[in-house]
Amino acid sequence: MGQKATPKLNIYQTETKIKIDGELNETVWQNCDVANQFYQSVPVDTSYAKSKTDVMTTYDNKYLYIAAVCYDTNSQPFIIQSLKRDFSYPISDAFAVYIDPYDDHTNGFSFAVNPKGVQREGLIQVGGNYGVTTAWDILWFSEVKIYNDRWIVEMAIPFSSLRFNPGMEKWRINFSRNDLKINEGYSWAAVPRNFNIASLPFCGELIWDKPIRKRKKSVAIIPYISGSSQKKYQPKNESPEFSQGFGGDARIGITNSLQLDLTINPDFSQVEVDRQVTNLSRFSLYFPERRNFFIENSDLFSDFGFRQIRPFFSRKIGLNNGNIIPIVGGARLSGKLNKDWRIGLMNIHTNKSGNTPQQNYTVAALQRRVLKNSTIGFIGLNRNSFDSSGINQSDYNRIIGTDFNFNTLDRKWAGKFFYHQSFKYREIHQ
């Protein structure tokens, strides 16, 4: 079909109250511009979609609304592998949206729903090269209605959960749909077969009817109280021992694109456990970070170097050879300063546990977008131990470094250059 032009979709504000029920009874949906020219992405990327899909968008002061009518050409049952939240998109019938609110081709958000109404949301980092990070969770709303020849999904995504720069007149966006009953996948903006469907450089444009306004600052506080009791019956009946804990997290939107995360005595008991893997190699396994405090903008800290050589790996904080080290507290500021600059600052303090002394971790990262789709970044890290007298001046590790990530706009060419230097007490004072 040759080179495909970037598709555009206009979005208009509504004063109508929209009920999320999957029925699209509100008249506003009849007046929306429709995105309905979809292309195949699976099994080939050279054809138009066989099954029709209509997508409409609108918004009010609080929510971005998206509705999709997914028509069926096959009356067989839907293919759905799991009813678990954050299901695997490639192996399920589903509709998904990918949003790049900064128009920087680098960071964004994804929301998906399958015909059974199961939700999936995640962060898109590094331009979508690695798909969607589903450890990120927010509250949003969706409903599905199934008919004989189609199924309809209706979404309401709160602006308070999205990071964006006010005043922008367009976002980048893409819609995709899996119709696995006929073994096909579609996208509104064509994505070449050899790229991930979440790749942001291939998104279309969402044109706002007026520059999007600044939203109210969002503040979320999540406290917890825990308690436990244990009693030994052997070798003798002893009195029970009680323990208690309290703490919490806070998420404060400094601006619409800059967020402050705070944590005190964090409790990660609700975090999904890692899958069990038998490691027969001589190298350590790298499991993804699932603790919410570290998730958003995690690529700003963790994407330096490459997979086997990372100067910063957040999973090491709070763990020592598999043993849990209690985290006293931490603060984390991360996000966008403007379209081209990103900043990240983090400080975490862990308590003494066994032979492991108190530790303080500080990370600072700065990233600049260059050459339209490339980035140059700088990072500085410091780990310092504490003893009974305070900072242990002879037990520290420090790293400074820079990375240059090169990507052409069409993603045909990519490369990476980095230099990191580590400093230890023995090396400086020998």
Regions found by a protein language model. Name each.
Residues 63, 340-341, 397, 404, ...:
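A general secondary-structure boundary signal
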Residues 388-390:
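Solvent-exposed loop segments that connect transmembrane elements
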Residues 254-256, 368-374, 385, 405-415, ...:
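Secondary-structure transition/capping motifs at alpha-helix termini
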Residues 244, 327, 349-351, 360-362, ...:
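Transmembrane beta-barrel architecture of outer-membrane proteins
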Residues 2-369, 374-378:
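Structural preference for beta-rich elements and adjacent junctions enriched in aromatics
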Residues 326-328, 334, 395-397, 408-430:
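Exposed, low-structure sequence patches enriched in small/polar residues
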Residues 247, 251, 397-408:
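Extended, compositionally biased low-complexity polar/Lys-Gly-rich tracts
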